Amino acid sequence: MSISLRRCAALAAAGSLAVFLGTPNPAVHLPFVMLAYPAALLLASRTEAPFRTGWAAGIPGAAAALYWIAVAAHKYGYFPWLLAAPCSILLGMYVALWGGVFSWIMARVRNVSPWRRAAIAGCVWYLLEWTRGWFGTGFSWLTLSSGLAAWPELVQPLSVLGEYGYSGFLAAAACLACEGLTRLFGGAASRKAGLVLAGSAALMLTAAASFGSWRLAVMPGRLAAEGVPVSFTLVQGSVRQDVKWSPEYQRQTLEHYMRLTLDGVRANVGALSGAKEARPQAAELAPFMGRFAPEGDATLAPALPDVLLWPETAMPFAYPSGPLSGELRGFVREMGLPLLFGAPGVERSPEGKTLLYNRAYLLTPAGDGGHYDKEHLVPFGEYLPPVLDWKIFESLLQGLGGFEPGTQEPLFAVPLSN
């Protein structure tokens, strides 16, 4: 193996390990390792084939980080592993493709100063992640900043820079560190410059962490002074995917969520008691409580949460046209609390085509309060990529057909008792 080929292989291995270990995975999650990925791509820009090397540097890691798509295809789409694994591999190749573009662009500016090169790297990374978020159907998974989500102090700059802007900031810091380290080990003449570059990168990351620590320290006080405390009851039904969409399980799923909601409200009554004044009295909940409480206890303290939250597609039927929609509305009326929940939404296009949306609904005791359609959908789970819209993959969509991406819509207001 030639020196050039060995170097490309080493960069590919380093980049892929950085992507996999730097993002949540079932093995080992080392958030800061993700910063080695843009550094590996910067080094790839100095090879004879920057695009190919940069692309290869991300494929295994991105495919491994998206392992859950293959698992879903195998477990719920009933694909043999021979067909399920390529779902993750193809998406990994697509994500890594943008890394190849980054290396190719950085190869064009290899002769500028390291400071300018790092600044360019940050801007290019920002633009590439932003473009990947909307290009085609948009695929915004595995962003650089998302790798740090496990450390709250390090993600607070998102409040100022946004996800893609912070990714660009991190990429610039990683490239500065790479420039510095290559000089530190490159000979005595360049060590001073390398120390300054690496120190600047460390200063950038320290500033981000310091801002995060400061923000986490002051925000509780600011929220207490300026905001309104809101209490939630969150319910996760954990309904098995292989039965979730079966028509015969729809009522069972609805009643399961109703029971869990009542259990959650009861469990929190003690903590919330006395915190609110205007609340439905226990007598108002008696009809529903008498139906679903196994022990027949229809008493609840006046203190209840402000909002009930159920997850994405919690209800396995089209709302509001589904046969159980009336019972769901009755539940919310009797609880006297607003409910945010997910369910499929069905619309008709002007051409008469049926359009399916992954929709979040707000339902209040007074009636429907608005909805939001999910914009970034999961390939092979919520839709089939255009180039792979084959009949063989239809089982992955759980018999629903593909969801349509939503358009940007104004947020709806949740009515609070206070």
Go through the PLM ranges and name each one:
Residues 214-418:
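Soluble catalytic domains of enzymes that build or remodel membrane lipids, polysaccharides, and related
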Residues 2-220, 246-247, 255, 274:
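Membrane-embedded alpha-helical bundles of multi-pass enzymes
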Residues 1-2, 286:
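Short, intrinsically disordered terminal tails adjacent to the first/last structured region
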